[in-house]
Swiss-Prot record:
InterPro entries: Aldolase_TIM, TAL/FSA, Transaldolase_2, Transaldolase_AS. This is Transaldolase. One of its GO terms (cellular component) is cytoplasm. GO terms for molecular function: transaldolase activity. It is an enzyme of class 2 (transferase). Transaldolase is important for the balance of metabolites in the pentose-phosphate pathway. The keyword Cell inner membrane does not apply. The gene is tal. Keywords: Cytoplasm, Pentose shunt, Schiff base, Transferase.
Amino acid sequence: MSNPLSELSAAGVAVWLDDISRDRLRTGNLADLVANRSVVGVTSNPTIFQKAIASSDLYNEQLRDLKVRGVDVGEAVRAITAADVREACDVLRGVYDASGGVDGRVSLEVDPRLAHEAERTVAEARALWWLVDRPNLFIKIPATQDGLPAITETLAQGISVNVTLIFGLDRYDAVIDAFMSGVEQAIEAGRDVSDLASVASFFVSRVDSEVDARLDKIGTPEAKALHAKTAIANARLAYERYEKAFATPRWKALAAKGAKPQRPLWASTSTKDPSLPDTIYVSELIAPGTVNTMPEATLQAFADHGQVKGETIRPHYDDARQVFAALAAVGVDIDDVIETLETQGVQKFEDSWNQLLGTIAQQLGRSGTDG
């Protein structure tokens, strides 16, 4: 009997779960997914936490304790999310140890309202690193223009980073540079970088959602023929840049000092278009040294009927370039698409964060978002 998730892992794709909740932790569901579904990492974001806390009674005891202590809403959010992430880190500690620190990682995002404030982002990253106090933690920092120096400085301080909200190829180049600069600075400071890790989270399905809407407005046969092709082409060309960047003398010098490469991570891999196969953003993005983080529905769908037919990225670089040429020919401004998606991405996480603050404030018996 085939095991698609095991086959995916054997092809060099690390399977991560894009979800966390206290229910999932306390019922043993996460441990079961690690044991039986090849899951070797976890990602979270403000939207995931907002839904988890709003829909569960398992946070009530901690909320009562926080209320008695009189903590503010922001501190309460940090305490609650850090507790879940710490517990998930412990569930995955065996994976972390067995993989030499490559996998077994759990991600916790900085306050998304700091997306354009580098110094405060670094301070928040440091505080969360101290609060969770687990070596297999990733701090998530968005790849905004202002986020880039924060990524470098956080890594330079010896804190592992998941760079999130990457949509475009040029920004991905800048993320790789920020990563390498951070590793270089960490080495200059005398740090052991053998356990300093990073992933670059490239968002997939949202690209198709935005581009396909524009193609529908254009409405020509040429435009319609490009439907659902951009996101995969974009991710494939990102992997090509990854291969080139991590074959340079600059990287080889860092690797010789024990540094691990920053792996590409495919995020936003659930299909938003019901006409598409529900595993398309997994099966079409298979290459060694990558991570695919999936919501549980996508994970279980791939376990049920996913197919691994060898590599599906490197053989298709020329096809991907042709997609981008065709997009330009029909009038899609890909730079505007990327800028729109980054703005929307930051705003969505800010909105979820504010909802989360509101949920916690209500539970604590006070109003406002004084986080």
